[in-house]
């Protein structure tokens, strides 16, 4: 078992990483929650696989448990889904002294976290991430949000969980496409903060070799994010480097209506494309983009897509949350393991 402590001024919490942790979820929940009712928000796929077993596991600790399931996919992370969830919480008579659990990948984590932050002006919640992307990235750091038609994550808040429970063995039910999706974020961490991690990923013989070491990889990624979040909780400085590849990535997701490329796949393309642009402008060490592209391809990720002359891409970039005071902050690399913030305008991409 590995435990990381996220230490923040107003709220601190543990990230627990352990194979087969799902058999002990109820026990761990009891260490941070002494109320009566627990509402689990998940999606239909995960509910079919884990819902009943996890519900019983938590009930065995004396809690009253309700499972609320949504349609899988990014389109559930929208305002149209919220009233249905709020009404089910009201039917369950959930109070501010009760608990919400986010059981799922990045979409469920963002959605359930947003519900927790807004229902009755705020209810405690726990993250139980089940996808690689959520385990290494989105479950840590307190960002919760829903999408608007004009862009991703445009309405949200910073709302930290009481606890993050990560069972790497739950990745065994994850479709390969979404394992690759998470690898996009894993590679990002190596790019921005850890040359050692990047080279470790280069050194694995293949994806199966990586999977045998997945617990260690998850720990390294969470530890990097923990350090960054502790230094810049509200995303006004250093934390922006975590968005390497995301400016173009979010635009790609939006252009394809969230149906072709998953978040991690789009970020992978964004990292490759922006590194090539930066090299052409002598803002990134020559050869960096080639190494990134090679590593992405090694793990089955796309590296390019045509978004030229697309007005929607330009508008999506303008709405990027790293835009401050009329300027666009893009995340570039000096070299592998050295991400930095570069102040520019949308014309950078033209």
Curated annotation (Swiss-Prot):
It is found in: Cytoplasm. Its cofactor is NAD(+); Co(2+); Zn(2+). Pfam families: DHQ_synthase (PF01761), DHQS_C (PF24621). Its main location: cytoplasm. Its EC number is 4.2.3.4. GO terms for biological process: amino acid biosynthetic process; aromatic amino acid family biosynthetic process; chorismate biosynthetic process. Zn(2+) binds at residues 185, 246, 263. One of its GO terms (molecular function) is 3-dehydroquinate synthase activity. Pathway: Metabolic intermediate biosynthesis; chorismate biosynthesis; chorismate from D-erythrose 4-phosphate and phosphoenolpyruvate: step 2/7. NAD(+) binds at residues 106-110, 130-131, 143, 152. Coiled coil: none annotated. This is 3-dehydroquinate synthase. It comes from Clostridium perfringens (strain 13 / Type A). The gene is aroB.
């Amino acid at each position: 078992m590995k435990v990381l402590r996220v230490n923040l001024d107003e709220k601190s919490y543990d990230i627990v990483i352990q194979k087969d942790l799902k058999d002990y979820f109820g026990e761990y929940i009891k260490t941070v929650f002494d109320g009566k009712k627990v509402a689990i928000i998940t999606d239909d796929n995960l509910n079919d696989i884990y819902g009943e077993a996890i519900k019983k596991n938590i009930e065995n600790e004396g809690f009253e448990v309700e499972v609320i399931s949504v349609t899988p996919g990014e389109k559930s992370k929208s305002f149209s889904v919220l009233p249905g969830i709020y009404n089910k919480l009201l039917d369950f008579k959930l109070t501010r002294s009760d608990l919400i659990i986010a059981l799922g990948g990045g979409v469920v984590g963002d959605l359930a976290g947003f519900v927790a932050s807004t229902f009755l002006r705020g209810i405690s919640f726990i993250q139980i991430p089940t996808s690689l992307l959520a385990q290494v990235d989105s479950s840590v750091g307190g960002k919760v949000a829903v999408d608007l038609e004009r862009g991703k994550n445009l309405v949200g808040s910073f709302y930290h969980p009481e606890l993050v429970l990560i069972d790497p063995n739950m990745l065994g039910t994850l479709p390969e496409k979404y394992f690759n999706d998470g690898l996009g974020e894993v590679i990002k961490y190596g790019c921005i903060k850890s040359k050692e991690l990047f080279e470790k990923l280069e050194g694995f013989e293949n994806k199966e070799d990586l999977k045998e070491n997945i617990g260690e990889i998850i720990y390294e990624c969470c530890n990097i994010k923990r350090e960054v979040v502790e230094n810049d909780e509200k995303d006004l400085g250093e934390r922006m480097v975590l968005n390497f590849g995301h400016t173009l990535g979010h635009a790609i997701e939006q252009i394809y209506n969230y149906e072709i490329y998953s978040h991690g796949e789009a970020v992978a393309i964004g990292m490759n494309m922006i590194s090539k642009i930066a090299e052409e402008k002598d803002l990134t060490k020559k050869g960096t983009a080639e190494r990134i592209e090679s590593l992405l391809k090694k793990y089955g990720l796309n590296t390019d897509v045509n978004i030229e002359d697309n007005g929607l891409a330009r508008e999506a970039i303008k709405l990027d949350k790293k835009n401050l005071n009329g300027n666009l902050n893009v995340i570039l690399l000096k070299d592998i393991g050295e991400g930095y913030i570069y102040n520019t305008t949308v014309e950078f991409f033209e």
